[in-house]
Structures are given as structure tokens and as C-alpha cells.
Amino acid sequence: MKKFYLYILFCLVLIPSPSFAMKNDVLVSSETKYYKTIYESDSNVFVLSNVVDKTIEISEQEYNDVYDDVKVMESNSNQTSYKKIAISIYKSGNDFKYEVNLEWKKIPKVRSNDIIAIGFDNKNIKANGNYSFIQNFCTSDGCKSNNSYSLRTFSTGSSATFSLPTSSLTYLNQIFSFTVVKKITEKIISQTISGDYSHATSKININNALKHSVDVDSGIKLYNSISSYYDSIPVTKTTWTGSW
């Protein structure tokens, strides 16, 4: 057991820094939330089409106390996943950078096309590009990264849709970020952004997974035709106040 946990620690050391922040980026606002999602099937056999999920916010202590983080969620009719989501605002030169970071405490059983997103108030700002996405994961062969994703942009936010690795994993996290600029000449004294994540609990192809929008209050807004394919967590918000 001791060797096992030493191996996990070794893998974590090899994982790239969990942020897209550059040397000159300054963190000015952030919020971290911890969630537990319980998946229940209405039969003794776990059938993907009849899964009901319930998500509740938990404390950092409860999240950290889940010691069996390297196990895939159980294959019986009741499963529990734990997620940590962090949403951050960075001062980046004359502009700002938004970032959302999702970390899994337990590796999800279903691996399909998931969605990570950032919503923002578009009254005074607009996205300026510089989109970045990375998925960090560890297997028995070591730790790797993948930056393959499909981008969706809206006036009120942006999202990255991506496929989860299908191999046996011991660690998994995703990071998405982009920069924003002012679209007014007047001074801006506050910015509010939100981070959100939708995990596919059923197999769904990429074309259908892209059927969503993003805004600051609702986070990821799935079209009705695909809403039953995903679980959900509450939107996590952070607000910066100052002078820009």
C-alpha cells in the first residue's frame, strides 16, 4: 500500500502546473467549491439510460478525506463522484484572463464528451481569444497531457468540449482559459465570472455535445435534446472589484 501511494505522489509531481497563468499574470479573484454527486439507477443493474444524479456542495475537509481517489467509481447501482472546481480572474498586462480548473477526486466510470465553461457579464467586456485548454491525466505508464477540444464561443461565455481518456486512470483534471478586453472607454470597477462543468453520464457524440450555450448566471445551458445525457454541478462564481 505504501508503494502504491508513493507511485501516485510521483505521478502528481510529473503533472504540469495546474494553471495557464503566465509569469506576469496576477491572481486578483478566485473561488473554489467542492461537490459530491451521487448517481442512482432505478434497477439493480447500472443502466446508463435510467441514471438519476444528485449533487450537493461539501466542505474541503470532506473532499480531502476521500482517500480512495484513485479508484474508478463502483460499477454497482449507486456511485459517488467528487469534483473540485476553481474559477479565477487574473490581471494579464492591460487585460484580464479568466480560468476554470476542474479536478476529479474519483475517476468517472463513463467516458464520453464532457464540457467545461466560463460565463461572464458581457455588458462592458468581450472575449479576446487566446483560448487554452489542457487535460492532465495519469496512467500506470506515467502522466500525460492532451489539448484536443472543440471550442464554442458566445457573447456571454465560452466552452471547451472534449473526450475523456478511455484508459485506466489514476488522476484527471481539465483547465480552460481565455483573455478578455474592454469594449467601452469608461472605467470598469467590477467583473463577475462563473465556472461550470457538465459530465456525460451516457455516451454522446461530439456533434450533439456541442448543443449548448454559456452565460454567467446559468453556466452551461444544455439543449433539451441532450440534457438527459449529463449531470450538473452548481455554477461557481467569483467577482473582482477595482479599477480598469
Please give the residue ranges for each predicted region.
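Homeobox/homeodomain signature
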Residues: 4-5, 9-10, 48, 230, ...
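N-terminal propeptides/leader regions of secreted preproproteins
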Residues: 22-84, 88
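Serine/threonine-rich low-complexity intrinsically disordered regions
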Residues: 1-2, 59, 205
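Intrinsic low-complexity, intrinsically disordered segments enriched in polar/basic residues
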Residues: 2-6, 30-37, 239
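Mature secreted bioactive peptide module from preproproteins
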Residues: 71-244
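Sec-dependent N-terminal signal peptides of Gram-positive bacterial secreted proteins and lipoproteins
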Residues: 1-23
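N-terminal cationic amphipathic segment used for targeting or macromolecule association
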Residues: 17-19, 33, 158
